[in-house]
Amino acid sequence: MQLIDEVDTDQEDGPLGKRRISSTMHMATMFAALGGLLFGFHTGGISSAMVAIKQKIQLDHFWQELLVSITVGVAALSSLVGGALADCFGRKFVIRCAGFIFLLGSILFIGATDKTSLLISRIIIGLATGLTCSSVPLYIAECSPAHSRGFLVSMNSVFITGGNFISNFLCAAFGSYSGNGWRYYQVTSIATELYCLYAFAFACVPALLQVIFFHFLPESPLWYLDHGRVLDARDALKRLRPNLLDANKEYELIKARNDRDEQMFLEKGRPSIWTMLKSLHYIGIFMLGMSMFMFQQICGINAVLYYSATIIQMAGVETVGISLWLAAASSGLYFICTIVSLLLVERFRRRLLMLGSLLMVFISLIIIASGFHLIANSSPEITIHDETTQSTVCGGFLTCESCVNSQRCGFCYENRVDKNGSCLPTTDDTFQYSAVGKCSQEDNTFGPAIWAPEWCPSEYAWIPIVGLLAYLISFAPGLGMMPWVVNAELYPRWLRSIGVSLATTANFLFNLIVTLPFLSTVDLLGKSGTFYLFTFFTLCALVTFFLFLPETSGRHLLSPEEIQWRLYSFQQKPFNSSSHSSNSNFRYMKIRAHNRQFYNEDEESSE
């Protein structure tokens, strides 16, 4: 029995100030999550930027997919080394390095004037993204108290969606400036413009704040323990916990479990990645962590976010400005839903949130796919056949849908009830005009005609948009947050960094697999077919997690062996520490005035 003396008359906080979070812990979470904000800003915002960029710089589907996905591909590679760097040099070091690289990437974007310079800046941003995503959730989880870990780790998701919303909003707001609005929100080129300076300040200030102020925040206490710096671990806990009693109690807990594990390692040898491959339990942990991010991506979230403005245009919204504002509104809704989800993450079990989210996402995707199916079936016919296009590929199409599915053609129509229109070839240097006919730049009759290079007018355009909004609302509390939270809780200490790193790599790899060929997949399967495919993957995820997903809430990070699998066969563990746990049940006596209260640590941590 270990005795901890305290005189405390504050009865409302419960045992050991159970529900309080220190100001330092809040600051550590916020400044770490700035990396998530920059991640969301630079990746999600490309959705709206792409609509404006392709108006100024001729970009076919390949270049659009490349500029969107190159950041994700580089992030997948850098996240592989992010875990090793975080283990070697510390979580703080990697997070600050990522902030500096984000700053460099933003500055390089300033001079972007063509495809190549845009591509280089996106590669630099991808490097920072991978380092951020492999270290920030790890740092927040290891610094957080068990009772608020889900809430605090979820702040990273809030900042990611917040960055996404801000970038979409700025792109919509500046999108009308001579076709160069995409420059101003990401800071490029004409630095003499006042609004460009404001945008530059926003893009770079979060990175600067993270690099500077993160220096004064504590390192992860568990990282200190892993490197034998026990006094530093104790000092870090004193700064991160609301009072000395909480810090001392948690220090004794993690020190005892650390000593127990070290004794076990001395007797059985230190575990390695090969240890994981010999046990169904650790294989199950590893596969579950990866599958959560895999399904997060193949259910379509980043395809929807990255191409939201394009999807809204595909639904039949006529003007670029309206589609940009609708994309900003959809990302704003997702941001709000993520904030609301913070209220749910510690009130409901992780498993319940995940399964409920998947069910609603499944229904939402059916609505989107059905809407696009109705739009395709009601596509306007080609009623005006331009003599100059009869010998071209555009002259052979009979409906608007078949016309716009070809990258070389677009639909030119009069904005009337009957939607009389023709299929005309696009130009080589811009999507704004057709090469010939009423929608060409030279034709004097361009005014009353509308040029639709990638979409068709339809009375059903509202259905996919409603489904898109329902999808974002449904996705946020489960698939949006839970993969980050559960991955931070699944792994034992010796597997945590590599586990989070590999799971993050899986996240980016499947992100790349989905987003890189997204527009090409739409060309191949059609809009409705693409979203029916996402619907099928969501159903697979629902079945998989119903069968295999365990509950991880309320567990201490040093006791992942407490996880109860849905299938008993996964309970086998090669490193069962029960034989070394004679000292694992510590009882703490808290003296409060004249009363004595006894607390069993294992009971408290399982609440």
Per-region residue spans from a language model:
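Transmembrane-helix signature of 12-pass secondary carriers
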Residues: 2-238, 262-415, 420-607
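Short arginine-rich
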Residues: 242-249, 563
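Short, well-structured alpha-helical segments
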Residues: 247-262
